[in-house]
C-alpha cells in the first residue's frame, strides 16, 4: 500500500518532528509498504489523493496551547480528495496539554472527512519506529 507521512511544526524545519516522521516511516516500510514523508510547511498544495493511508504528525503551537499549527488545516484543505481516507494522527510529547492537542488534531482531520483509525503521543524516535512497525495499514489497527 502507498502510505503518506505528513509532519508540520511551527517553523519550516523542526528536527524533532522530522526524526519522528522518519522513524515512523521506517517502521511502516519494514512491513513492505511504500512510504513517503513530507513537511507540510514546504510541500503546501501537494495532492495526496492517490495515497491509500495518511499519517499526520504535528505538535502544539506553544507549551500550554491546545492548538496545532495553522498550516495543518491549510494543507488538508488543499490536498485534494482526502474525504474517506483512512488515517492516523500523532503528536510529539512537548506540550503540557497533550490530550487537548490530540483531540483538536482529531477534530480537524475528521472535519475534512478523514476516517481516523489510530491516534497516539510519540515520545521519541524508538517509540515512533515501534508504533510504525505495529501499525496495520491494511486494517488500520495497532497490535
Predicted region positions:
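FMN-binding flavodoxin-like domain, especially the glycine-rich phosphate-binding loop
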Residues: 2-12, 16-40, 46-143
Amino acid at each position: 500500500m502507498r502510505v503518506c507521512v505528513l509532519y508540520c511544526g511551527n517553523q519550516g524545519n523542526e528536527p524533532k518532528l522530522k526524526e519522528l516522521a522518519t522513524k515512523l516511516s521506517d517502521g511502516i516500510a519494514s512491513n513492505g509498504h511504500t512510504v513517503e514523508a513530507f513537511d507540510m510547511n514546504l510541500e503546501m498544495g501537494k495532492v495526496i489523493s492517490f495515497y491509500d493511508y495518511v499519517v499526520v504528525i504535528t505538535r502544539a503551537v506553544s507549551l500550554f496551547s491546545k492548538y496545532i499549527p495553522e498550516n495543518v488545516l491549510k494543507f488538508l484543505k488543499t490536498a485534494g480528495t482526502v474525504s474517506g481516507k483512512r488515517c492516523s494522527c500523532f503528536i510529539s510529547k512537548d506540550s503540557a496539554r497533550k490530550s487537548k492537542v490530540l483531540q483538536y488534531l482529531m477534530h480537524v482531520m475528521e472535519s475534512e472527512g478523514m476516517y481516523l483509525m489510530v491516534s497516539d503521543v510519540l515520545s521519541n524516535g524508538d517509540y515512533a519506529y515501534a508504533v510504525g512497525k505495529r501499525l496495520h495499514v491494511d486494517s488500520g489497527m495497532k497490535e
